[in-house]
Amino acid sequence: PVFTPERIRREPDCQQQLAQLGADAYVVVAFGQILPPEILQQPPLGCWNGHGSLLPRWRGAGPIQWSLIEGDSTTGVGVMAMEEGLDTGPVLLERAIPIGLLENAHQLAERLAGLTGTLLVEALPLIEAAGPGPEAERLQRLGVRVQSEEGMTYARMLTKEDAQIDWSQSALSIHRKVMGLYPGATSSWQGKRLKLLVTEPLVKRLAAELSPEAAELAARWGLAPGENPAPQKKQAGSVLEVVSGVGVVVATSGCAVLVRE
């Protein structure tokens, strides 16, 4: 059975419904709520969470979005034992994957969802084989990795203010935000609110990772490694070029950004 309560701590019937199942273990994925101690203590094989980051980096509600916004080159999935803390539990299994430059939050979430399913299929037989007993002993038998607080980052909930694009930032920062907030990044043009869906940073050193059209534009509007940005004739956020069938080139603090959708 699958339960998706809106506020698990405010729905007393949930605890009773779960207890009546007599389940050996509980598995939580993309739930976004902390289980109360009364529920954590119910299943004899523990409560387990499939989390979309390489813990302790990006504990919290938005690990996929923040890994893109902050420009992480890799992310992954971990299966961890749940505790009262927010994503603080020891990790049983973990897999890392690279993040593509042009990958958005929806695409990355789909890849991580598939990986989560694969990892849980691997983890559950191990959890079953370790058997019931005091939590500390069970986890020791499983050989879990205790999370370090070093390198911990928190993936806070995103707000409407986060969605607004600041064109005075770098091309990469703007592009990462559009990808991470997909489909929610916004800007304005002549008093109209626009939603930005697809961008490419016109950075020369990244030409191999860009589309052919963007790589060609990067030769004109990008910067080579070590090259300082020349003073823009137009201020950040201004349109530099409109390319039919491709998109709009927009000025930033350095290299330009190609807005495709």
Task: Label every model-predicted segment.
Residues P1-P183, S244, G254-E261:
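One-carbon transfer enzymes
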Residues D162-E261:
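An anion-binding loop in the catalytic cleft
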